[in-house]
Amino acid sequence: MNVTVSHIRSALQECYPPREAANLSRIVCCEMLGHSHIDYYLGKDMILSPKDEKELESILFRLCNFEPIQYVQGTARFLGRTFRVAPGVLIPRPETEELVERMLEEVAPASRILDIGTGSGCIAVTLSKELPEAEV
């Protein structure tokens, strides 16, 4: 089936303001369905297999029910790394990134660090990668 970028954007504009719908449509097309960024911005049609067509329907349904894009994708970005998330795991927040950046500035390299209620693991993994001498 041929699907246009404008079709996806229009479907999302029924639920979201235009700028947010445009951003979500780019994520859906390029990151989730594998459409190239160039083809996306040129507005080229996507040819979807029946499986991808069902996936698109599911994605649009979930987004129009205001499920966070991170849960729909199954991933969230945190300080340049990608972490798996699902509805039972809190989505890493920018404020948490700021906290970890501050810790990286102030914590001694060989510190002992405990992350309680680790969720996605973004704090512990990032601190462990950035402070290899620390015990996390």
What annotation goes with each model-predicted range?
Residues 1-35, 39-41, 45-48:
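Non-catalytic accessory regions of SAM-dependent methyltransferases
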Residues 5, 25-26, 56, 69, ...:
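A general structural signal for well-ordered alpha-helical segments in protein cores
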Residues 30-106:
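Conserved AdoMet
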Residues 95-136:
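Conserved SAM/SAH cofactor-binding pocket of Class I
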